[in-house]
Regions:
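Residue-level signal for inorganic ion chemistry
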Residues: 19, 106, 193, 281, ...
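Short, well-ordered secondary-structure micro-motifs
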Residues: 6-7, 29-30, 80, 107, ...
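Active-site anion/phosphate-binding pocket segments in diverse small-molecule metabolic enzymes
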Residues: 44-46, 51, 59, 66-69, ...
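Active-site-proximal beta-alpha core segment in soluble small-molecule metabolic enzymes
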Residues: 42-44, 49-51, 65-232, 248
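Glycine-rich phosphate/diphosphate-binding loops that line cofactor/substrate pockets in enzymes
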Residues: 9-13, 54-65, 153
């Protein structure tokens, strides 16, 4: 009883726990506490599927080409530390985050793999230095801010070049000054030079993509030749890996493909979805013809129907735009359309055509 009373201050996560003792100790109460789930709605992430997806892409790469895995935005909503830890065990070359605080959180959780920060802020350079994070440098201004912040301390950086995306990156006219500044500050070590393709998935824009590849080849060769130490290159994102093998370079950046989505049918058929959003049927109701369902009476029973009230709503991330027949769910292995508006914590599905559904079913 004392142990159960203290569960609110004890934290267990991903632990293997052995409960051993006589029946009189009522260990079943402890088991119930450990496995208890307070919310019927969960996002289940299949890490084995993620490994499959990683290997699918690796099969298209030469052995000497490494992988930079994007784990920004909570690993595309899949769990930052969990995904990063798995990728670390797969000996990934680099992890990439959008902001420094994402990288700091991974370091605090024990991740030791090299981490690239793709959208650094000058106010975070101290923390990046402390936690061994490597910022992307994309302008002379951000480079100067880094120099002022770190003084003579050493720091690894990644230089981004503009090749046609018109997002972050040094334009060609800045390259000479960039090289000169880096030569003056030898404590700043360039680990990679890279750019980003704007339309690698779109065959109709292949001429533009090939022009980007050509520009990157020219600019990166000039840049790398200006230093007396090795600097690696990367250009391709997930959708470019299959389509532009001539641009594999030293690394590729795996983003959404790692999580199961690719524009190429050849690759997509080999990928596995890693996420499954699950909930339970709270109640089943018979709704007579002519009655309405949900807010604003948007759902209308055109005939006698059976609905399932589900324990998921827009507060759980199930977008309100999925209401009124737009969204579907799987119940008992069959598709069921959402009827009526999505509520904050609930929604309703038309299960008239599905037999054997009971309260509490997944």
């Amino acid at each position: 009883e004392q142990l159960i009373a203290q569960f609110n201050v004890l934290k267990f996560e991903n632990e293997l726990i052995l409960l051993k003792g006589a029946r009189k100790f009522s260990f079943e109460k402890i088991t119930a506490q450990l496995i208890g789930q307070t919310h019927a709605t969960v996002l289940e992430v299949n890490l084995n599927a993620l490994i499959n997806n990683l290997n699918v892409y690796k099969n298209y790469l030469p052995k000497e080409t490494g992988v930079i895995a994007m784990v920004k935005a909570f690993s595309y909503g899949s769990g930052s530390t969990e995904v990063a830890s798995l990728l670390e065990k797969q000996h990934i070359d680099y992890l990439a985050v959008a902001y420094a605080d994402e990288g700091v959180a991974l370091r605090k959780d024990g991740i030791q793999t090299k981490i690239m920060v793709m959208n650094p802020d000058a106010v975070d350079f101290d923390r990046m230095q402390e936690y061994h994070l490597e910022p992307e440098i994309y302008s002379l201004q951000i480079l100067q801010q880094l120099i002022e912040k770190i003084g003579q301390q050493e720091m690894n950086v990644h230089i981004k070049l503009e090749t046609g995306m018109n997002r972050l990156g040094f334009v060609e006219s800045e390259q000479e000054e960039l090289i000169a500044v880096l030569h003056q500050h030898k404590n700043i070590h360039v680990k990679t030079v890279f750019s980003h393709l704007a339309a690698s998935e779109d065959e109709q824009l292949d001429s533009f993509t090939k022009e980007q590849i050509s520009i990157f080849k020219r600019l990166s060769e000039t840049f790398v030749a200006s230093f007396n130490y090795p600097i690696k290159k990367h250009l391709l994102n997930s959708s470019g890996i299959l389509r532009f093998p001539e641009a594999h370079y030293d690394y590729v950046r795996l983003g959404i493909g790692l999580y199961g989505v690719d524009s190429s049918a050849t690759i997509q058929e080999k990928l596995l979805p890693i996420g499954k959003l699950k909930t339970r049927v709270s109640q089943i109701k018979q709704v007579p013809k002519g009655e309405t369902i949900g807010y604003s009476r948007k759902g209308v029973a055109e005939k006698d129907i059976k609905i399932g009230i589900l324990a998921i709503g827009y507060a759980d991330g199930y977008d309100r735009r999925f209401g009124n027949g737009t969204g579907e769910v799987f119940i008992a292995g069959q598709r069921a359309k959402i009827i009526g508006n999505i509520c904050m914590d609930m929604c309703m599905a038309d299960i008239t055509h599905i037999d054997g559904v009971n309260d509490g079913d997944e």
